[in-house]
Amino acid sequence: TNMSVGLTCRDRLHMIYVENRLPPEASLLRMDIGLKLPMATTSAGRAYYCAISDKGRKVITDAMEAKYGDAWPEKQEGLERSMEDYKKYGFCLSLGEWDRNINSAGVPIHLQDGTIMALTCAAPSYLISGEKLRESIAHQLAMLASDIESLGV
């Protein structure tokens, strides 16, 4: 598929790309290393948020509520929906919520030292529907994350 695949880590209320692979024809999806993504609306951020401890999640939730103010209820709804998906399926989605033209899936990767990162795949919404992402690609991404964790990194 014509999707970008990326690895992100947390920086306050953002996720930062530390590695990324783009398809050669990617014009809409320029996710360069070092790019900061908002935690609340991206699949990377949501995957991280869902995978951390309740205590850690409370700290982040309080900080996001203060940051977003009146926009917080909409962001909170997206995070709650992602938590439901994560508990059921092991992945999180962002279907046009960060960028209306981008659909993405994210899964956490738990490293042996306790660090949590997020693995993502994303594509323009005209190439990958939310349904295809949910029914096929996100499950494959979750299996890839599990394979990476089993390597003991």
Question: At which residue positions do the language-model features occur?
Answer:
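Short, basic/aromatic recognition patches
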Residues: 61-106, 143, 151
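Structural motif
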Residues: 4, 15, 104, 116-118
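Amphipathic alpha-helical effector-binding/dimerization core
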Residues: 1-63
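Sensor-regulatory modules in signal-transduction proteins
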Residues: 109-112
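A short, polar/proline- and glycine-enriched secondary-structure boundary/capping micro-motif
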Residues: 27-30, 71, 129-131
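Juxtadomain coupling helices with adjacent low-complexity linkers
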Residues: 76, 89, 100-101, 116-153
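Generic alpha-helical structural context detector
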Residues: 46-50, 84, 146
